[in-house]
From Swiss-Prot:
Chief location category: cytoplasm
A GO term from the CC aspect: cytosol
GO MF annotation terms: DNA binding
Record-annotated membrane-spanning stretches: none
Descriptive protein name: Probable transcriptional regulatory protein tll0175
Family: Belongs to the TACO1 family.
Record Pfam families: TACO1_YebC_N, Transcrip_reg
Lineage, top ranks: Bacteria, Bacillati, Cyanobacteriota, Cyanophyceae, Acaryochloridales
Cross-referenced InterPro entries: Integrase-like_N, TACO1_YebC-like_2nd/3rd_dom, TACO1_YebC_N, Transcrip_reg_TACO1-like, Transcrip_reg_TACO1-like_dom3, YebC-like
Length: 250
């Protein structure tokens, strides 16, 4: 009986992992479609597409799936309803601002899903522009953490950027979005391994949450939004102490 129970738990866990993997594949495939549509199907001349393909390969998406997504983006392969990129904005618990980027073939469905997620946690989906002014969009280049910070600074100066943050095993370099390709290539030329490139919405000011109930609802809303099929990214202006964050996952 114990053995059967263990096997049932393993099956449930595998189903969750498979479902999550499917969502990641769909999200990355959509990013490839949009990149190919906007900049053409040649990765050599389309940095956004090249970056999307690299992320897809890193996630284990088969090459034929990648080629199919490119073909859909360029119009050489018939596809379903066209995808469009839409930005949604709203307020979560505690007045936390949410900026959400979606790729959808049905904006009414996506808006309804978002509205339900916000309402469940006591937030509300707002009008375009209600929180967008609180964020700035930056390019982020993630590299392996440098052993010599002085040499790293020299590489950053060569790339004409100054803002960076060294985390545990990586460093994040901030630059204007149009400079992502140049900064990435310059860092590679200086011997740094580029792990990721992306555009990211960064809050100009933050809202600190100090009580557990509000923090829990904010995190639940973030999880709910990120798990929606159409959502590509979720940015917020929330901040909370490490102790409070740890308490949420006990």
């Amino acid at each position: 009986m114990a053995g059967h129970s263990k096997w049932a738990n393993i099956k449930r866990q595998k189903a969750r992992v498979d479902a999550q993997k499917g969502k990641i594949f769909a999200r990355l495939s959509r990013a490839i479609i949009i990149a190919a549509r906007h900049g053409g199907g040649d990765p050599a001349g389309n940095f956004q597409l090249r970056s999307a393909i690299e992320k897809a390969k890193a996630a284990g998406i088969p090459s034929e799936n990648i080629e199919r997504a490119i073909a859909k983006g360029t119009g050489t392969l018939d596809s379903d309803a066209p995808l469009e990129a839409i930005r949604y904005e709203g307020y979560g618990p505690g007045g936390v601002a949410f900026l959400i980027e979606a790729l959808t073939d049905n904006r009414n469905r996506t808006a309804a899903d978002l509205r339900a997620a916000f309402n469940k946690q006591g937030g509300n989906l707002g009008e375009t522009g209600c929180v967008g002014w609180m964020f700035e969009q930056w390019g982020i280049v993630t590299v392996t953490a440098p052993r010599d910070e002085e040499a790293f600074l020299e590489a950053l100066l060569a790339a004409d950027v100054e803002t960076y943050e060294i985390l545990e095993e990586v460093a994040e370099v901030r630059c204007p979005v149009p400079a992502l390709e140049t900064v990435s290539e310059t860092l590679k030329e200086h011997g740094y391994t580029v792990l990721d490139t992306e555009s990211r919405w960064i809050p100009m000011n933050t809202v600190e949450i100090t009580d557990e109930d509000t923090a829990r609802r904010v995190l639940k809303l973030m999880d709910a939004l990120e798990n929606l099929d159409d959502i590509q990214s979720v940015a917020t202006n929330v901040t909370m102490s490490d102790a409070l964050m740890e308490a949420m996952y006990v």
